[in-house]
Amino acid sequence: MTQTFIPGKDAALEDSIARFQQKLLDLGFDIEEASWLNPVPHVWSVHIRDKACALCFTNGKGATKKAALASALGEYFERLSTNYFFADFWLGDTIANGPFVHYPNEKWFPLTEDDEVPEGLLDARLRAFYDPDDQLTAGMLVDLQSGNDERGVCGLPFTRQSDGETVYIPMNIVGNLYVSNGMSAGNTPNEARVQGLSEVFERHIKNRIIAESISLPEIPAEVMARYPGVVESIAKLEAEGFPIFAYDGSLGGKYPVICVVLFNPANGTCFASFGAHPDFGVALERTVTELLQGRSLKDLDVFTPPTFDDEEVAEHANLETHFIDSSGLISWDMFKQDADYPFVDWSFSGTTEEEFATLMAIFKAEDKEVYIADYEHLGVYACRIIVPGMSDIYPAEDLWLANNSMGAHLRDTILSLPGSEWEKEDYLALIEQMDDEGLDDFTRVRELLGLATGKDNGWYTLRIGELKAMLALAGGDLEQALIWTEWTMEFNASIFSPERANYYRCLQTLLLLSQEEDRQPLQYLNAFLRMYGTDAVEAASAALSGEASFYGLQAVDSDLQAFPAHQSLLKAYEKLQRAKAAFWAK
């Protein structure tokens, strides 16, 4: 078998692919290559997923088909090892009360009456960073996955790189502020760590360049000529009508970052891709492959025009959009003729061990502490790297303003609504409670509660505003029900099934009629039946009477048996739990 070695990797691509695929089979995961893209020469991307659980998927990119597949499989192990596939979901009562929720080496810190953040969690530096004004409480730090107040706060062990000490960081903080940033898997610990640290630089410097509207120096043609594959990819994009700028994003040779920008003159928009690696050529190639990961040439019309409004560009919401799908705003200043920094033909490359030391030295020079959690329980090395003040995707204030576990205390109540027989005032009191707690009307209930509902039921599209319409109906407040029904039709109509949209049109009509005291409802019944159909008229009438107000929502038990999608997710998690238990028992 031929062996292909590429810079930055400590094993041949063929060996990595064979090893990763075999390990996945051994763990019980049946992975399929769902789609491939090769829009220009030397740019490949692939989407792989678990046949039994479509929520477990990754994308890979590379200059060759093999490199893209190895990339996707590596990312799959990264997300399995760090539990990232399950980061947005409640794992149910059984796992929440099992021997361990995340890893056997986790540590639980019980909640106390004063709700102070428990001793033994975080170090002094982290406490000062996450909670400078003493606003954090222990209750805010219960993790979404367990939602188990009785067990307390779950801390995961990280190694502080400056002195090798173990520091316990709440899973809640890891999940809320860092999401997928700084996670990596690889053939060796150094290879994976270099990748994870490079990603931290990439995102941090990208945010700085965008937020500060920095104008970057172009990479000279003679430097680009060292990388003929990249030159050919760019030439093809330009031939298709997309001007390309390749920039040195190192800010004067300090950071191993490259930026490539694509213009789309057909609609006046642009898109900036960033990549980082100690090896200049690897960083450049990554940036170009990232530009087109999961995109064909006809998918390049979804970005935004450049702007002169630098304040809007610097807003945190814009930077979050760039993290999610790179479709945020960019300042025209990035493209100024006179760059803010000179071009540097930088190189931080060496063996992966040397590269790790080089990158760590940059963090040390900036007085940034690095915390690393190592994971080897799946037979492939993976890690999660946290650099407070550099790798955070969301600000620390989100822990009290937008915590992913802020709806956990409502979970049992909301899930029990479809079969409930409460007093009318209790339904209306729940609307008041949601208002008092400041829940956003646009929030999807499944995301608030951490549910994988599948797309075939009303829970999938249910937002807080629509839930308020249902509660108002159940509480007999028809005026409020009409307000929230019309809100629902305005904001959710585009994602409703035809049946659900028709039901809401019918419900709105019946609610409007209920306000007309001098009209006789039966006079209109035949017309309604012909307009909306018997099923919708009966369902809307039952909602109006308070007899069945929760249209399309099935009752759900505490282990979420009602949602096959959630059950497939839990089955995947059980495979991981078995592997963890076996590894830590050694």
Label for each model-derived stretch:
Residues 1-586:
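Helix-biased "structured C-terminal domain" signature
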